[in-house]
Design a protein with these regions (language model features):
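Flexible inter-domain connectors and hinge/loop segments
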Residues: 1-148, 186-194
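Transmembrane alpha-helices and their extracellular/periplasmic helix-loop junctions
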Residues: 122-221
Length: 221
């Protein structure tokens, strides 16, 4: 979370505090709505959050996307003199044995300190992933719309044609989802609409199969 509530007070996270200090302590504000936190603002940077003050992290890549330096090299003065000039420096452990590793989309052993680095990078470059009440509304509409289309279309098609139509709809939805994500940094739910479409297709297919079997038995009888 970017903010933590404790005894009726709100406290900023490490990433927010570091960016605030790096930008020379500009205006820092918390934007609240009746349902909870809406966003955090640092100067003119508006950071979108969920109602709990959590940021959806836009990971820049796998571990060591950001430069790592060994403390031994620093103590031995083996680094360039300007290695840390005008940089935000995070000090933390990255060894597996210290258990400060987290599961992320890029790795199951992602150093916790580099997660903070990703958050800081997101804030400074305003490179946020969007998942708001609007996108949640779109998610619901997608479930209803694709469900209705399949529910109306599949019963009117032959089995092979229906299977092709269902596959094309699912493929189109996946392509649109990825396009929106990579083009607009907007996260639309992929799982629930796909489950809905698969369930409706399988349900209708199974229903028609047993219906045809009953009709065949009647004809034989």
């Amino acid at each position: 979370p970017l903010v933590i509530a404790f005894e009726n007070n709100y406290y900023s996270s490490l990433a927010v505090s570091l960016v605030w200090a790096y930008l020379d302590f500009p205006n820092l504000s918390l934007n609240l709505e009746p349902f909870g936190v809406n966003s955090v603002t640092i100067d003119d940077i508006v950071i979108p959050t969920n109602e709990s003050g959590q940021l959806l992290i836009n990971y820049m890549g796998p571990p060591q996307t950001f430069p790592h330096y060994s403390i031994a090299d620093i103590l031995a003065d083996r680094l360039p003199k300007d290695a840390f000039r005008n940089k935000i420096v995070l000090v933390g452990a990255t060894a597996i044995g210290i258990y400060d590793l987290r599961v992320t989309p890029f790795s199951s052993t992602f150093p916790g300190v580099e997660i903070h680095a990703n958050v800081i990078d997101n804030i400074l470059h305003r490179n946020f992933l969007i998942h708001s009440s609007v996108t949640r509304f779109i998610d619901v509409c997608s479930i209803i719309l694709f469900g209705l289309i399949l529910g109306i279309l599949i019963p009117r098609l032959r089995p092979i044609t229906g299977m092709i139509a269902a596959f094309l709809m699912i493929a189109a939805f996946v392509v649109i989802n990825f396009f929106v994500f990579f083009s607009f940094n907007t996260w639309l739910n992929l799982v629930y609409p796909l489950i809905t479409m698969a369930t409706i297709y399988l349900g209708i297919t199974i229903y028609h199969y047993f219906k045809e079997e009953r009709e065949k038995k009647k004809i034989r009888g």
